[in-house]
Amino acid sequence: SGSCTTKTCWTTLPKFRELGYILKDKYNEAVQVEPVRASRNKRPTFLKIKKPLSYRKPMDTDLVYIEKSPNYCEEDPVTGSVGTQGRMCNKTAQQSNGCDLMCCGRGYNTHQYSRVWQCNCKF
């Protein structure tokens, strides 16, 4: 007559919002690099930091990038982005259609609209 104790361990991911904050911080700290070839016909053998402000080799968990991301706030015929200028936005929304986010900090004009329609109401 003995007793048996079982322990089970597992790894879980952090909450999705926490993960988003971590990725956003890593994105903001990302460093631009350029591939360097040892010879003309070989694949790149290492990445060089493009604008070294202070020398710190990126760690395996850091984000690096080769090309800058396009600015979707401005019109860019090369990428096909029409920009956000002149688009309607929702002043009170916190999502992607909200004015603060969509207008990229440029400010926005507000307009008040009135709409009249037939409601077929009976009193």
Curated annotation (Swiss-Prot):
GO biological-process terms attached to the record: animal organ development; canonical Wnt signaling pathway; cell fate commitment; neuron differentiation; positive regulation of JNK cascade
Annotated stretches, region: Disordered linker: 33-61
S-S bridge residues: C89-C104
Gene encoding the protein: WNT7A
UniProt entry keywords in alphabetical sequence: Developmental protein, Disulfide bond, Extracellular matrix, Glycoprotein, Lipoprotein, Secreted, Wnt signaling pathway
Official protein name in the record: Protein Wnt-7a
Keyword Lipoprotein included in the entry's annotation: yes
Residues where lipid is bound covalently (O-palmitoleoyl serine): S1
Family from the record: Belongs to the Wnt family.
Cited InterPro entries: Wnt, Wnt7, Wnt_C
Post-translational modification: Palmitoleoylation is required for efficient binding to frizzled receptors. Depalmitoleoylation leads to Wnt signaling pathway inhibition.
Annotated glycosylation sites: N90
GO cellular component terms given for this protein: extracellular space
Quaternary structure, from the entry: Forms a soluble 1:1 complex with AFM; this prevents oligomerization and is required for prolonged biological activity. The complex with AFM may represent the physiological form in body fluids. Interacts with FZD5. Interacts with PORCN.
Entry keyword annotation includes Secreted: yes
Matches recorded under Pfam families: wnt
GO molecular function, one term: frizzled binding
Function: Ligand for members of the frizzled family of seven transmembrane receptors that functions in the canonical Wnt/beta-catenin signaling pathway. Plays an important role in embryonic development, including dorsal versus ventral patterning during limb development, skeleton development and urogenital tract development. Required for central nervous system (CNS) angiogenesis and blood-brain barrier regulation.
Chief localization: secreted
Subcellular location: Secreted, Extracellular space, Extracellular matrix; Secreted
